[in-house]
């Protein structure tokens, strides 16, 4: 029994704290140049502005400018009750699945995020992928009547 307790204590010490390598990496991130961070911030602002502009052109979407992270939450309830002839869209989860299957674009229904009338779209990707994704989404949504 005492061996188990000793091993348990030892294991806790090994796994409960960050390793020295990650501590050094964190120190370098905090004390080093912030230029890469500024470049990433500009890139995400550009992508945000691009996806907002393009999503506002999607008939049926209501779009607000995101204030944090890298997700857009367009309101999509306009499409609830609509169908492509094969499946009926009842909620944002149905719409996200439809967009995955028909447009091959991954979105997430907003219910899990407290926004059941929205879908969550990430813009943590290239400008080209954003443009192509919105093109595919528009094409898929146009099939819903």
What are these regions (language model features)?
Residues 1-145:
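PLP-dependent class I/II
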């Amino acid at each position: 029994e005492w061996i188990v307790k000793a091993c348990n204590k030892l294991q806790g010490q090994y796994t409960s704290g960050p390793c020295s390598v990650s501590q050094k990496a964190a120190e370098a991130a905090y004390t080093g140049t912030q230029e890469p961070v500024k470049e990433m911030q500009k890139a995400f602002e550009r992508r945000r502005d691009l996806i907002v502009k393009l999503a506002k052109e999607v008939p049926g979407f209501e779009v607000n400018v995101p204030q944090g992270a890298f997700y857009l939450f367009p309101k999509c309830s306009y499409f609830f009750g609509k169908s492509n002839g094969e499946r009926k869209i009842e909620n944002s989860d149905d719409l996200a699945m439809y967009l995955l299957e028909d447009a091959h674009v991954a979105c997430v229904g907003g219910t899990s995020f407290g926004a059941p009338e929205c879908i969550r779209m990430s813009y943590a990707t290239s400008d080209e992928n954003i443009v192509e994704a919105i093109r595919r989404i528009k094409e898929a949504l146009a099939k819903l009547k």
